[in-house]
Amino acid sequence: MKKEFKMENGTSILMFGGVKGLIRDGEDLKETLQIFRPDVVCVSIPEESIDSLEKFMEDPYELTLSDYEIIYGTILSEFGEVMVPPPIYMEAVKYARHFSIKLEGIDLDEDSYSQVYMDNMKSMDLIAHSVRKRRIMHHSFKSTKP
């Protein structure tokens, strides 16, 4: 999904929606960036994840995935080829590096997320989370779109 917004001052903002992990969405983003030529790229990950992606690109290492990431990848693979780290993030980093532009992470950092999580999660939420994870592992999904 792509949508361009024209601001009153003449600035254009392009919103690109992709599925985290699908290789084809990374390829679509790469093509979109080449056409749109942004001066700044914002991605829906925290700044610390951008640093990790850059380090990974310089010296790839084995990644450890959570249970949810494994389940997500397994289900997502029904819709196309999947890759970790997600190609949509990798392409954003590659583009920003190549054109020496600013890459902004716009999600909460780990400390902020942890604080919000601790302030809002209750014991029953954690129990529901465990039950939901168990159900997802045994659920059969029938969607034709990711």
Locate each region found by the language model.
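Hydrophobic, often amphipathic alpha-helical segments used for membrane interaction and targeting
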Residues: 52-146
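A short acidic, amphipathic alpha-helical/loop segment
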Residues: 26-32, 92-95
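PAPS-dependent sulfotransferase catalytic domain
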Residues: 47-49
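Hydrophobic/aromatic beta-strand patches that form the interior of the parallel beta-sheet core
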Residues: 14, 42, 102-106
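Short, flexible loop segments at the rims of nucleotide/cofactor-binding pockets, characterized by
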Residues: 16-22, 80-83
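N- or domain-start disorder-to-order transition segments that initiate the globular core
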Residues: 1-13
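Proline-aspartate-enriched helix->loop->beta-strand connector
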Residues: 34-45
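Short N-terminal binding/cap micro-motifs at the start of the first secondary-structure element
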Residues: 21-27, 52
